[in-house]
Amino acid sequence: MIGAGGGAIINITSVASRLPGDGPYADRSGGVLPGYGGSKAALEHLTQCVAYDLADHRIAVNALSPSKPILTPGLSYYARDFDDTASADEFARAAVELALVDPGRVTGRTIGHLQVLDGSFRPFGLD
């Protein structure tokens, strides 16, 4: 990307990075949620660090987080009582939109996918 003069890196994160708790999973016997949330929090921090390092190369580094649960086979197996979910296609569309933003104006951010689709996130400059 440096040789190409720019680009976009999008890390996929989760609301679990910011909101501890059981989430949609009724059975915590596996003990995976603290590790999952902790790894997503670390990924958001890494996103900010790499964005800082690559800003001069016009490479945007952002994290995309589901604004609402994405109905995947795993979630549908473990989760209960979700009335409002997002489709994987909707999330993918948000990733494409985020990849097209100006790297000088949106980088180092964790953005919910609905904010990308409705344009409600605010670009900013590094100046």
Q: Can you say where each PLM-predicted feature lies in the sequence?
A:
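Short alpha-helix in the Rossmann-fold core of NAD(P)-dependent oxidoreductases
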Residues: 4-5, 39-40, 84-87
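Residue-level signal for short amphipathic helical patches enriched in basic/charged
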Residues: 4-7, 101
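Catalytic loop of short-chain dehydrogenase/reductase
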Residues: 8-42, 47-56, 68-70
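Short aromatic-enriched loop/helix-cap "lid" or pocket-rim segments at secondary-structure transitions
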Residues: 21-24, 73-77, 120-125
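Catalytic Tyr-x(3-8)-Lys segment
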Residues: 28-33, 73-90
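C-terminal helical subdomain
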Residues: 56, 63, 80-127
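Flexible, glycine-rich beta-alpha linker
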Residues: 59-79
